[in-house]
Amino acid sequence: MQKLFLYPLNTFFAVLLGLLFTFFNFSYFYKIPSYNDIFRIFIIMLAYLFISIFFLKRKKINIIPNERLKNIYKPLLVISSLGFVIELVLYGIPLLAQGGRDEYKSIPVLHVLFYSILICSIIFSSIYGSAKSIIISFAIALVISVLFFTRQMLMVSFMIFMISMFIRYSQYKKIYIYILFFIFFLTVLFSFLGDIRQQSAGDYVDNYVYMIGGANENGTMLGTALYWVWLYIASPIYNLYLNFNVNNEMADACITYNKVGDCFSPYISNVVMPNTISKYIGAEQIDIESVVQNLNVGTGYAKAARLFGLAGVISQITLQFLFYVIGYILTPSRVRVVYTIYFSALSFFMIFDNLFVKGEFFFVFIIIMIIGKFFSSPIKENFEKKM
């Protein structure tokens, strides 16, 4: 059962879930997928299944209690919390700002660092910490998510928690009940944050999600909370279908990005390179095609599909696998479980977005490696003996 929660099988089932959601007719905006659409998604799923069968025949993961790593969440939580408090003092609260998060300014680079450190705190508390430490770190994450409208942080945090809990307590049957409860809680909270974000932007109306999602009679029967979930899982897959079709229909898919029609440069800067770095060097950020303008999320594969079609997506999956292998080798053995769980959490969200290239999520890998190196060094050993 562990394999179902870990990369790459968790991504396989996430993509399968997205595919299945697009078969439900809940919106006037979207059509049932064509055979070509289904075939392309099927190939993506086969790629992850191939990696699982032939390359990652992982054994059962056991989380060994570690007193050194158990309390590392505390300094991480303090640093990130202080950083966010400073931002709130300097720039105000996005929740109360006119225009919401879209017009909010933050401390360059440091905001990304605070974000990454907070996620690290959640990772280590979920894997090694007590119930108290988990509650504290999640309470802080929840507050930050609401104040800054960072639903991605909240979703990734819950996924990290669920994977960690399942691995830590998989021998107990009650863990399945707890996981279902947290999924339900996340569903309700997700829809709540979606509503208050639109309210802060000043464009909220009753049953807002029905309006932006083009809900038909079947869709309204779901209720707003479940319709939010269906819309945010299905609409990226629909947009992925569209980007595949646009690439297939255009004679030169990249002529809109540069005069020579070069696809390679935008592929590197948008699909492979962390966006914090690509923005710093001035690389062009491309936009994907979307069926509905305001629902412009297209999974983590849409940009690759827009540039190179199915070949671009398969290349992306291959590069992602190589990244996992190289990162696993470079990560100190003491924290490889942490690395695996975090990578698995991000890979699950490929049905929403490519979080691997988002700076705030990418730099978490570096922090994990630094912590692993620090706790494996002679300096740390001597320091702990003196303590």
Annotated model-derived regions:
Residues 11, 15, 42-46, 80, ...:
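Alpha-helical transmembrane spans of integral membrane proteins, capturing the lipid-embedded, hydrophobic core
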Residues 91, 95, 110, 293-387:
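Hydrophobic alpha-helical segments
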Residues 55-58, 121-129, 237-248, 321-326:
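Transmembrane alpha-helical segments in integral membrane proteins
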Residues 32-35, 53-168, 183-201, 286-287, ...:
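Membrane-embedded catalytic interface detector for glycan/lipid assembly enzymes
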Residues 135-136, 151-159, 174-179, 219, ...:
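Hydrophobic alpha-helical membrane segments of integral membrane proteins
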Residues 2-14, 68-77, 130-136, 176, ...:
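Membrane-interfacial loop-to-transmembrane alpha-helix junctions, especially the N-terminal start
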Residues 190-316:
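Small-residue-enriched transmembrane helix-hairpin modules in multi-pass membrane proteins
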Residues 1-82:
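A structural signal for hydrophobic alpha-helical transmembrane segments in multi-pass membrane proteins
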